[in-house]
Amino acid sequence: MRTVGDVVRLLVEFLVLWGSSALALIVLDRILGGITLDQSSFTPLPTLPAALVLALVFGLLNAALWPVMMRFMSWIGPVLLFVGTFLAGGVIMLLTLYLVPVAAVDQLSDSFVLAALLSLFTSVVSGAIASRSDTAYRLMQVRRQRFRLRRNAALVDASPGLLCIQIDGLGYDVLRRAIADGVTPGLAKLVRETHRLVPWHTDWSSQTGATQLGVLHGSNHNVPAFRWYDKTTEHISVFSNPADNEQRELERTDIPGLLAHDGASRGNLFTGGAHDNVLVVSRMRGARLGGGAGYSDYFADPASALRTFIRMVAELQRELRQSLRQKRKDILPRVPRGGVYPFVRAFATVLATDVAAAAVVGDLIKGRSVVYVDLIGYDEVSHHSGISRPETLAVLTKLDDVVEMLLAVVEQADRPYRVVVLSDHGQSQGATFLQRFGETLGQLVVRLAAQREPAAVQRHWYERESDVPRQPGAEGRGYAAASVHSPTAGEEAHASAGEPIVLGSGNLGLVYFPHLPGRADVNAIEAAHPGLLTGLREHPGVGFLLVAAPGGSVVLGPHGQVDVTSGEVTGENPLAVMGPDALAKVRRTDSFDNVADIMVGGTYWPDTDEVAAFEEQVGSHGGMGGPQSTPFLIYPADLPAPPNPLHGAEAVHEVLVGWRDLSTDY
């Protein structure tokens, strides 16, 4: 029930906002040309009455019309919607001036400027009311949302819900150092007081698509990499494509998703069976990004929109400054960070994070049974800046603030929640394959297959996904691209006759020969391309190859090989540096229908803990070697402990389902 204190607090907030908005209008009247408030002779401030009336009516119209306009514009992507918020503000200001003509503007554009500046000022004041912390600002919104729910007599389940927060790309070892160094005080407090921190181990394909498919839907079988080729359909599947992700879900409808009952999916690649989705790639429709109503709810608050805009601008200038600093100090390894990347970074670290976090806040107040959210900012910046450099850790600190904010909301929610924090994979660092050896994996394969010199090898169509420099991360790129245009329906393969298709996912490469039927074995590959396998296995950037053979698949290394079925090693074991579970990972992938003709495991240098990605990324993931294969899991100490060791995304799914069923009435 609403207390007198709550009502008084809301009334004070309203009066402060109204009065400060009126004062802002008086100041703008004096410093801006093109805007004139009516004057009165009855007050010391002649323009005060007009300012009070204008501020009140503009605020009331904002409250009434803004949510409607945002829902109407939810059919466009959040980036374009973001621009639309400013146009909407101008329209509301024009309507205000028409209804209460207490001010005059010289030009139409002046009304848009006035609306934007007034909204910006009220955003600042709203934040000041709740102090300067994002947590306090969100808690102010929580009070308002909870008031509306209680006014509507909405009932909240009393059984504990489950909140899963994924920090994309954060490795176990990086997190432990961050906790020790004070980079993540929120997570540190969680681990030291109420939760436990453990590592888990990914499948061979250590990337978000494979992990989330396993964690959210219970199976990532037949997923060899972030992108792969289907010889039957001549189609390249890629996890940044909504149609492909939807197909992956349809293939798993026999398994109830983690979020199937009263669940919510926020910022993920997949729904997990949830019907309520915001920023979910598999539910993108044109540019709606799956659940337009979800992010339009966020933009329905003009203060939120302006807070996000200010932070995006700050993130853009921060990226430009940090990129120049890397070049000036000649910090290596590094990759180009121009083009659209600064905007993708701002989208991933600010816009996507703000929208997803705000949606989770709403979920917690409504009392949803299970919520899974992916915070992608660290992963995006780590790809281009490095896995533990100061600028990357600064982003991690901000995500820690988001986690703290959500924990604070949990404390305010009517329904109790158990909170789990996890990552989908880590990242490994190092100069790229192209930087080290002067050619891409695709160029190397074509050169060896055709016995041509490097200068004669041209860039081919199939390299555009795997080898183009300055490629943003999967999640950030996919979301941002869909914000301004409809995503493509996939890649259809049209390689020249006899030429291989080469795809890359971190330091995992996939080589297909479309002209060879089925899965080509060593004999077929050698007959079609003599010397290719020898050239690849002897290359310093290639750690091992997985290929089919008449007697069973084999792993080939520079000085030895492993029988996949029996595990028998001849010569030096090329998997020895990849960890004790490397053969099991390879064996599982070898059973997939769409495993590549040649699976290429990039070299891992244990002395420096580095890999050489087949993509232009400083921090990479997708294969084996280094911290990329060891993410983390933080869980409440009063829950049953997961298996130790915990191997594979499907095993994590089983653990989360068990915790979900303990916590909620499933």
Model regions: which residues?
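Juxtamembrane/disordered regions of integral membrane proteins
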Residues: M1-L117, V124-Y137
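Beta-strand elements within well-structured catalytic alpha/beta cores of enzymes
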Residues: V156-R176, L190, V215, V370-I376, ...
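Active-site neighborhoods of enzymes that stabilize oxyanions during catalysis
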Residues: T233, S240-I255, L259-D262, R266-G273, ...
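Short, structured active-site-proximal loop/turn typified by the sulfatase FGly-forming signature C/S-X-P-X-R
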Residues: R177-G214, G218-V223
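A long, amphipathic alpha-helix that forms part
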Residues: V350-L351, V355, V371, Y378-V419, ...
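Active-site-proximal N-terminal segment of extracellular/periplasmic enzymes that hydrolyze or transfer
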Residues: R138-H195, R436
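Metal-dependent active-site segment of extracytoplasmic phospho-/sulfohydrolases and closely related
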Residues: D400-G438, V554-L556, Q561
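His/Asp/Glu-rich, glycine-adjacent segments
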Residues: T135-M140, G218-G386, N507-F513, P517-R519, ...
